[in-house]
UniProtKB/Swiss-Prot annotation:
It is an enzyme of class 2 (transferase). Keywords: Acyltransferase, Cytoplasm, Iron, Metal-binding, Transferase, tRNA processing. Its EC number is 2.3.1.234. It is found in: Cytoplasm. This is tRNA N6-adenosine threonylcarbamoyltransferase. NCBIfam families: arch_KAE1, gcp_kae1. Disulfide bonds: none annotated. It comes from the Archaea. The lineage of its organism: Archaea, Thermoproteota, Thermoprotei, Desulfurococcales, Desulfurococcaceae. The keyword Nucleotide-binding does not apply. The keyword Acyltransferase applies.
Length: 329
C-alpha cells in the first residue's frame, strides 16, 4: 500500500510517500522565506503552487512509483493559513480526481504525533508539540487525543523567530540546524533573568518575549539569548513533566519544528531519565512540517475507511487536536 501526502499549512510545501510499514519512500519539501517580516499567506500560497507540482514529480521519482501505483492521496486540511491550506487541497483534489484515487483529509497536529509514534514504536506517549504556531502537550485517550496543556498566546517557534527578527539576528532563523537565538547565546556564562510563566499545564510566552526585547537594549546580548531559550525550554519541559504525572504514561515524544533543537532534546531526555520514562528523538526531517507525516496519517485513516470525495474536500484554518476523531486509538 502506498499513500502520497501533501503538507501546506504554513511556510513549507512538502510531498511524502509512505507504505503500510511506515517506511518513508520519499519526503521532498521546499520552504518559503519572506524577504522581510513574517509569513505573508498569499505569497506563501503562490510559492506552494509553484513548487508543489515539482515536488510531487520528484517524490514519485524518488519512490520509484507512478501515480497509478498510489492507493490514496492525503493532504493537510488544517489547522493553518487559509491560502496555503487551499493550495495544498487543490493539488490533492486534482491528483485524486485525475487518477481516481481516494482522498483523505488529515489534521496537521495529529500527523506530527502519529509519525513520531511510528518512528519510535511508542504506543501511548505524552506528545510535546512545539512549532511556530503551536505549543501543545497531549496524550492518547479514547478515540482521540487529550490536550493536557497548551500555550495561552504564541507558539514557542513564534517566540524565537519574532525575537530574532525584532533584534536583527534573523532571518534566516535556523543555521546548520540550530536556531539563531541559540547561536547568539554561545559564549555566555549565565542566562539573563527573564520571566517564567507556567499556569498548571498551560504556559505563556508573550511576557517572556516582551521582557527579552527590553533586556536586549540594556543587557549583555549573549546572556539575553541564553536566557530566552533556557527559560522557554524549561517551561515546555515542566508542563511536559506535569502531563506525564497526570497521565501516568511512560513514554514521551518531542515533535514540531522546534523539536530539532538539540538543547531542548537534552532537557527532555534528562527529565525523562529522572522520571524513569522512555524518550526517543526523531529525525528532524520528520519532526518538522513534512509530507511524509501527512501520508502516514492519511494511510491510517484510509485503512479505517475515512475518505472524502474530491468535491467534498475541506480545509479548516482552526482545527483543535482534541476535536479530531482517531479511530485507531
Amino acid at each position: 500500500m502506498y499513500v502520497l501526502g501533501i503538507e501546506s499549512t504554513a511556510h513549507t510545501i512538502g510531498v511524502g510517500i509512505v507504505n503500510e510499514r511506515a517506511e518513508v519512500l520519499a519526503n521532498e519539501m521546499h520552504t518559503y522565506v519572506p524577504k522581510e517580516g513574517g509569513i505573508h499567506p498569499r505569497e506563501a500560497a503562490r510559492h506552494h503552487a509553484e513548487w508543489g507540482p515539482r515536488l510531487v514529480k520528484r517524490a514519485l521519482e524518488v519512490a520509484g512509483l507512478r501515480p497509478e501505483d498510489l492507493d490514496a492521496v492525503a493532504y493537510s486540511a488544517g489547522p493553518g493559513l487559509g491560502p496555503c491550506l487551499r493550495t495544498g487541497a487543490v493539488m490533492a483534489r486534482a491528483l485524486a480526481a485525475f487518477y481516481e484515487k481516494p482522498l483523505v483529509p488529515v489534521n496537521h497536529s495529529l500527523a506530527h504525533i502519529e509519525i513520531a509514534r511510528a518512528v519510535t514504536g511508542f504506543s501511548k506517549p505524552v506528545a510535546i508539540y512545539v512549532s511556530g504556531g503551536s505549543t501543545i502537550i497531549s496524550a492518547p485517550a479514547i478515540k482521540r487525543y487529550r490536550v493536557y496543556g497548551e500555550t495561552l498566546d504564541i507558539g514557542l517557534g513564534n517566540l524565537l523567530d519574532t525575537f530574532a527578527r525584532e533584534v536583527g539576528i534573523g532571518p534566516p532563523f535556523v543555521k546548520g540546524g540550530v536556531h539563531v537565538v541559540e547561536l547568539c547565546s554561545e559564549g555566555a556564562e549565565e542566562p539573563a533573568d527573564l520571566p517564567y510563566t507556567v499556569q498548571g499545564v498551560d504556559l505563556s510566552f508573550s511576557g517572556l518575549l516582551t521582557a527579552a526585547l527590553r533586556a536586549w537594549k540594556k543587557e549583555d546580548k549573549k546572556k539575553v539569548c541564553y536566557g530566552l531559550w533556557e527559560t522557554a525550554y524549561d517551561m515546555v519541559v515542566e508542563v511536559g513533566e506535569r502531563a506525564l504525572a497526570h497521565s501516568k504514561l511512560k513514554e514521551v515524544v518531542l515533535v514540531g519544528g522546534v523539536a530539532g533543537s538539540k538543547r531542548l532534546q537534552r532537557k527532555v531526555a534528562l527529565m525523562s531519565e529522572e522520571r524513569g520514562v522512555s524518550f526517543k528523538p526523531i529525525p528532524y526531517e520528520l519532526a518538522r512540517d513534512n509530507g511524509a507525516m501527512i501520508a502516514w496519517t492519511g494511510l491510517l485513516y484510509y485503512k479505517h475507511g475515512f475518505t472524502v470525495a474530491p468535491e467534498e474536500a475541506f480545509v479548516r484554518q482552526r482545527w483543535r487536536l482534541d476535536e479530531v476523531e482517531v479511530p485507531w486509538l
